[in-house]
């Protein structure tokens, strides 16, 4: 069975690479279309045995006059590859495929929905469902998304649930003090971290702050510091997609409000080695599927404070597997930081439960087999 995966980025969406790697081991023929055949994850796709086609099939929002050419390129790609199934992983590429091929295309199409943002805005949610044809299928990556499609009128038979998987073996709770040495911190200094790219506000959606909640993390720190004088914070991850101005804004905000006890670290590739150095991970998202920042922290044995939005409660349940707080609430974040660090035994108990949930839900070997079964079902229906 030949599957065409269409990805909007070569540098992100690591979950797609892990999925493709396992699909290849299961015997599927995989073609991956993404913007570069040499940058980012492209070589790893090729090492996994997938064919890579360099093509950008995201919606050219800044150059709308290029849309006809993008649609034509999409049709040419599909005619050349002749896939049994087309699997898209982002909203933009999904809309391009549907617009290019139309509702009557005989090829089954799968949209594995990685986030909740477009579904929170009626126009984009309607665009998603209205462009779909009878052979379109959705894979929700959290229960919130699954319920939302049902509310939008999509038949439950056309919406599967399968979480975005990761390589569990990459994460261990062994502390190596890599980060603490870099920061010049003692082993017993309370260290709280936020690990996430900096996504600039989407003004066309009315956002005035970044959707990952960096501003809230910065605002919470001085509040928590009053009760935990030795507290130190670190923000790991730089600007996404060239959002340098936004990164500079966050750095200025941090320097102004946190007076040297919040360190900004660049994007780095050794995240599995860094996580165990944290005493607590904070994931203060405003909108979210289930963030890998929370998944990876729990897999590394690190307690998590996160917000009660989107699919996060599938993983982090208040008082069961972590701490849940309302979004956009620095005071609540600060209170949860203090509670977690002052009650280490309880925080450890919650983390063990969170780790158990994460190891089950996000094991890429298991989730990819679910996707493979979805493929088989769709092909049998199309026959």
Which residues fall in each region the model found?
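Conserved acidic donor-binding segment of nucleotide-sugar-dependent glycosyltransferases
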Residues: 318-319, 323-330, 339-345
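Aromatic "clamp/platform" in nucleotide-sugar-dependent glycosyltransferases that forms part
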Residues: 267, 286
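Short, structured helix-loop element that forms part of the nucleotide-activated donor/catalytic region
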Residues: 42-46, 214, 232-260, 346
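A short helix/loop element that forms part of the nucleotide-sugar donor recognition site in Leloir-type
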Residues: 73, 172-185, 250
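Short His-centered aromatic/hydrophobic patch
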Residues: 88-94, 113
């Amino acid at each position: 069975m030949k599957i065409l995966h269409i990805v909007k980025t070569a540098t992100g969406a690591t979950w797609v690479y892990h999925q493709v790697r396992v699909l290849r081991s299961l015997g599927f023929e995989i073609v991956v279309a993404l913007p570069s055949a040499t940058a980012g994850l492209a070589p790893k796709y090729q090492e996994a045995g997938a064919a890579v086609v360099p093509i950008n099939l995201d919606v050219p929002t800044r150059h709308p006059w290029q849309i006809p050419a993008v649609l034509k390129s999409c049709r040419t790609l599909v005619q050349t590859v002749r896939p049994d199934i087309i699997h898209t992983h982002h909203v933009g590429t999904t809309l391009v495929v549907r617009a290019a091929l139309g509702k009557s295309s005989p090829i089954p199409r799968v949209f594995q929905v990685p986030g909740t943002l477009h579904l929170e805005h009626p126009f984009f949610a309607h665009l998603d469902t209205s462009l779909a044809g009878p052979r379109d299928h959705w894979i929700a990556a959290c229960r919130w998304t699954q319920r939302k499609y049902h509310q939008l009128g999509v038949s439950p038979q056309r919406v599967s649930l399968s979480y975005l998987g990761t390589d569990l073996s990459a994460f261990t709770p062994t502390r190596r003090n890599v980060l603490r040495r870099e920061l010049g911190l003692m082993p017993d200094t309370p260290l709280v971290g936020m690990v996430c790219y900096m996504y600039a506000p989407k003004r066309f959606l009315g956002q005035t702050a970044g959707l990952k909640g960096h501003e809230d993390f910065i605002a919470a720190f001085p509040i928590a510091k009053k009760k935990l004088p030795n507290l130190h914070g670190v923000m790991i991850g730089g600007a996404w997609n060239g959002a340098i101005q936004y990164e500079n804004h966050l750095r200025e905000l941090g320097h102004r409000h946190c007076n040297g006890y919040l360190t900004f670290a660049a994007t780095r590739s050794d995240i599995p080695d860094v996580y165990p150095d944290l005493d607590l991970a904070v994931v203060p998202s405003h909108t979210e599927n289930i963030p890998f920042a929370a998944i990876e922290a729990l897999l590394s044995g690190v307690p998590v404070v996160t917000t009660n939005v989107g699919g996060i409660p599938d993983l982090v349940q208040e008082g069961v597997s972590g701490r849940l707080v309302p979004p956009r609430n620095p005071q609540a974040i600060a209170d949860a930081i203090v509670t977690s660090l002052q009650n280490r035994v309880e925080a450890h108990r919650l983390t063990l439960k969170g780790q158990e949930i994460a190891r089950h839900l996000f094991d890429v070997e298991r989730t990819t087999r679910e996707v493979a079964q979805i493929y088989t079902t769709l092909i049998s229906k199309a026959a």
